[in-house]
């Protein structure tokens, strides 16, 4: 594929990603699409090669689809409805559940000063 075709495909994927991420929020949808168009016309990092700029746009589209979730406040209490869609990446948080093997987590304090404090 030509460079022009690759750029056009990346732009289209970016527009699709904004529709997925901001589907119910017209203001954000229009703002994100305007920002994307501006970035295509005047690249924010012109020192990068065209291929790197295309790759960056593809990465942004992937991030928008997988990692961005919008919430909308429901009612008067502090409850929000999250717009989680089929492409949202849901982590399992296993790394958070594991205990850390640092001195601080074992009661050692900063720089090991309290290492024998809890024995």
Swiss-Prot record:
This is Mitochondrial zinc maintenance protein 1, mitochondrial. InterPro entries: Complex1_LYR_LYRM7, MZM1/LYRM7. GO terms for cellular component: mitochondrial matrix. Transmembrane segments: none annotated. GO terms for molecular function: protein folding chaperone. Assembly factor required for Rieske Fe-S protein RIP1 incorporation into the cytochrome b-c1 (CIII) complex. Functions as a chaperone, binding to this subunit within the mitochondrial matrix and stabilizing it prior to its translocation and insertion into the late CIII dimeric intermediate within the mitochondrial inner membrane. Modulates the mitochondrial matrix zinc pool. It comes from Zygosaccharomyces rouxii (strain ATCC 2623 / CBS 732 / NBRC 1130 / NCYC 568 / NRRL Y-229). Interacts with RIP1. Keywords: Chaperone, Mitochondrion, Transit peptide. Its main location: mitochondrion. CDD domains: Complex1_LYR_LYRM7. The gene is MZM1.
């Amino acid at each position: 594929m030509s460079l022009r075709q690759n750029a056009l495909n990346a732009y289209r994927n970016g527009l699709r990603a904004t529709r997925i991420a901001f589907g119910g929020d017209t203001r954000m949808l229009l703002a994100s699409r305007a920002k994307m168009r501006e970035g295509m016309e005047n690249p924010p990092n012109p020192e990068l090669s065209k291929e790197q700029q295309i790759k960056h746009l593809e990465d942004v589209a992937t991030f928008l689809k997988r990692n961005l979730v919008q919430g909308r406040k429901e009612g008067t209490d502090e409850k929000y409805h999250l717009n989680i869609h089929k492409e949202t990446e849901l982590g399992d948080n296993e790394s958070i559940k594991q205990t850390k093997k640092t001195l601080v987590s074992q009661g050692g304090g900063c720089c090991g000063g309290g290492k024998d404090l809890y024995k």
